[in-house]
Amino acid sequence: MQMLAFMPYTFGSMSLGKNPADVAQDLAVVRRAMEAGVWFHSSPTYNQGFTFMVLRFAFDENRSQVPKMVIKVRDASVPLIRFEVEDSCRRLGLDAIDVAQLVSMDQRPGNLLDQLRGGGGPLADELASLRARGLIRQAVLFLTPENSDAAVEATKSGLIEGVTLYWNACQRDCSHTAWAAIREQGIPALALRTLGGGPSDQFSSAKSEELAEMLKTAGCRNATEFNLRLAASEPAIRTTIGGTASLAHLEDYLKAATNAAPLSADILQRVEQLQIR
């Protein structure tokens, strides 16, 4: 499965555009990420669409530095998937989406996953058409614990290059069998929610003490370094997507991504137990 080449860190844009009346700081962060040459991850729905506004402002300042992008695309119906792809390209001034993160909004039988596994259907045909038109270069499927087995099977379709999932020191959002298949088959995986600022939600906060102890044992200066090293330790993970609206935090991400050394086998074993607990 030949996926486009990623850098270890991908800039997540979810925090941009929260205050659309004043985007000066957001623009400074985007400019620095563009200068660094990292991939970007975004969605047309972030912050009621104002995230795309910030990105477009920055892109139009220097079109020569427009990054490669992973963009969320909802795939519940033919009109929806077509609209989201065409609209994202129009709003950001892009010729194509480099990697479409296909997010299923339809769990009923016959959805996109079923069509990819079963030999076709209108959604799979539309995805093929968008690729043939050059509007989508590659595509990955978003995993959840409920759909991960089916999604991994669907990657055998010629329309899919890999998967995305929430994956970090506290979380691995797929079944044990799906994760084993990802590793064994070499399916490229993009990790969402780096936890570069440490535990940020109720689920990961419940594991914060154990994470802090592992961070100390590994000799990492902070959670950003630990989680970039964790991603570098797992061959299946092609990049980890970490969001920030802080210039200092972005610099920390970029520093941590430079020659990130894999963690020890002992630490990795402890991380795996924490992920699945």
Residue ranges, per PLM feature:
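Hydrophobic residues in well-ordered beta-strands that form the structural core
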Residues: 42, 71, 189-191
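N-terminal binding-site loop/beta-alpha segment at the start of enzyme catalytic domains
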Residues: 1-68, 126
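Acidic-and-aromatic substrate-binding clefts and catalytic sites of carbohydrate-active enzymes
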Residues: 17-23, 43-53, 74-81, 108-109, ...
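A short, structured active-site edge motif that brings together acidic residues
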Residues: 65-77, 99-103
